[in-house]
Curated annotation (Swiss-Prot):
<dbReference type="GO" id="GO:0008121">
    <property type="term" value="F:ubiquinol-cytochrome-c reductase activity"/>
</dbReference>
<feature type="binding site" description="axial binding residue">
    <location>
        <position position="75"/>
    </location>
    <ligand>
        <name>heme b b562</name>
    </ligand>
</feature>
<feature type="transmembrane region" description="Helical">
    <location>
        <begin position="170"/>
        <end position="190"/>
    </location>
</feature>
<dbReference type="InterPro" id="IPR048260">
    <property type="entry name" value="Cytochrome_b_C_euk/bac"/>
</dbReference>
<keyword id="KW-0999">Mitochondrion inner membrane</keyword>
<keyword id="KW-0813">Transport</keyword>
<dbReference type="GO" id="GO:0005743">
    <property type="term" value="C:mitochondrial inner membrane"/>
</dbReference>
<comment type="function">
    <text>Component of the ubiquinol-cytochrome c reductase complex (complex III or cytochrome b-c1 complex) that is part of the mitochondrial respiratory chain. The b-c1 complex mediates electron transfer from ubiquinol to cytochrome c. Contributes to the generation of a proton gradient across the mitochondrial membrane that is then used for ATP synthesis.</text>
</comment>
<dbReference type="InterPro" id="IPR005797">
    <property type="entry name" value="Cyt_b/b6_N"/>
</dbReference>
<feature type="binding site" description="axial binding residue">
    <location>
        <position position="188"/>
    </location>
    <ligand>
        <name>heme b b566</name>
    </ligand>
</feature>
<feature type="transmembrane region" description="Helical">
    <location>
        <begin position="25"/>
        <end position="45"/>
    </location>
</feature>
<feature type="transmembrane region" description="Helical">
    <location>
        <begin position="280"/>
        <end position="300"/>
    </location>
</feature>
<keyword id="KW-0408">Iron</keyword>
<keyword id="KW-0479">Metal-binding</keyword>
<dbReference type="Pfam" id="PF00032">
    <property type="entry name" value="Cytochrom_B_C"/>
</dbReference>
<feature type="transmembrane region" description="Helical">
    <location>
        <begin position="69"/>
        <end position="90"/>
    </location>
</feature>
<dbReference type="GO" id="GO:0046872">
    <property type="term" value="F:metal ion binding"/>
</dbReference>
């Protein structure tokens, strides 16, 4: 066993003292993931992947299985917590230049894609009204991609419509994809540990390192307990806050809900998809909205790693965060004049961030050279 792994094993990994609470979200993601696997297991035990029985089995879990309501709400709200944590985790990586650890960043982005796929399969498994319509829409969008994709969609979901085979495939795929995501997470963690984390101040912090245990373990535990508190309070008092009222009726392929909107964590990608009138273009933009994260390590031009001392980049970063929220909000609205325009402008600004990133770095380098 290499020396470094040995250190990690005993929690003696040297870590910079100045990494802030933004670095705690990785451990929270691990906790979310473990909880999703556990609750998902107990739900899957009682779930029936049949088009006629899926909805009834969900109702049965909620009403008849001991603590089934708790498992279901923990699983549903845990997914939302998971996505909140992962979005913060990515934003922190963007802000502090963590993406310059290319291996870690690329494995993490693949993880994000896998996670979104898994969450989608999980949502489709319930066979409720909103879920069925969303599944149909996603299948249609996937089929739009290319000539080959139609065959692939048919192979995966068995038909264009959500049929019994689709529910079975989605239930199995949610379980399989979660296991694959756990494996990829291990790879990401190993890659992250091998190259040490970026210090926030972007200076070399070798002289100022402390052991991970007990200092950062307790710091992680604090944020973790806060997250668990939020989770349990949400599950107890507002279990349906992230839910769609349409999900309380059984899926009916003949009746389309008035506003088909996915879970909140997909709204951002969905808003970008919707802002483009062309079907193929929308599907491409949807893929690009996530894939563009892969380009960030290769377009970093600034001589400074972190955004902490880069005011222009800070402005752009917070604009990006605001844009993300605006797209998420606009995607919940119907497709009508003001909202379509807002979506289009916000999507343009979102993509502009990644194009402006190298240009701003170049400008800042020139400014610093002159002084």
């Amino acid at each position: 066993m290499p020396h470094q792994q040995m250190l990690i094993l005993f929690g003696l990994l040297p870590v910079a003292t100045n990494i802030s609470t933004w670095w705690n979200f990785g451990s929270m993601l691990l906790a979310c993931s473990s909880m999703q696997v556990l609750t998902g297991f107990f739900l899957a035990v009682h779930y029936t992947a049949n088009i006629n029985l899926a909805f009834s089995s969900i109702v049965h879990i909620t009403r008849d299985v001991p603590y089934g309501w708790m498992m279901q709400n923990l699983h549903a709200i845990g997914a939302s917590m998971f996505f909140i944590c992962i979005y913060i985790h990515i934003a922190r990586g963007l802000y502090y230049g963590s993406y310059l650890n290319k291996k870690t960043w690329l494995s993490g982005t693949t993880l994000l894609i896998m996670l979104m796929v898994t969450a989608f399969f999980g949502x489709x498994x319930x066979x409720x009204x909103x879920x069925x319509x969303x599944x149909x829409x996603x299948x249609x969008x996937x089929x739009x991609x290319x000539x080959x994709x139609x065959x692939x969609x048919x192979x995966x979901x068995x038909x264009x419509x959500x049929x019994x085979x689709x529910x079975x495939x989605x239930x199995x795929x949610x379980x399989x994809x979660x296991x694959x995501x756990x494996x990829x997470x291990x790879x990401x963690x190993x890659x992250x540990x091998x190259x040490x984390x970026x210090x926030x101040x972007x200076x070399n912090s070798d002289i100022d390192k402390i052991p991970f245990h007990p200092y950062h373990t307790y710091k992680d535990l604090l944020m973790l307990s806060l997250m668990v508190l939020m989770l349990l309070m949400t599950v107890s008092f507002l279990p349906d806050i992230f839910n769609d009222p349409e999900n309380f009726s059984k899926a009916n392929p003949l009746v389309t809900p008035q506003h088909i909107k996915p879970e909140w964590y997909f709204l951002f990608a969905y808003g970008i998809l919707r802002s483009i009138p062309n079907k193929l273009g929308g599907a491409l933009a949807l893929a690009m909205s996530i894939m563009i994260l892969l380009t960030v390590p290769f377009t970093h031009t600034s001589t400074i790693r972190s955004m902490m001392f880069r005011p222009i980049m800070q402005l752009m970063f917070w604009t990006l965060v605001a844009t993300f929220m605006v797209i998420t909000w606009a995607a919940t609205k119907p497709v009508e004049p003001p909202f379509t325009m807002i979506s289009q402008i916000a999507s343009t600004i979102y993509f502009l961030f990644f194009i402006m990133n190298p240009i701003a770095g170049w400008i800042e380098n020139n400014i610093m050279k002159d002084n």
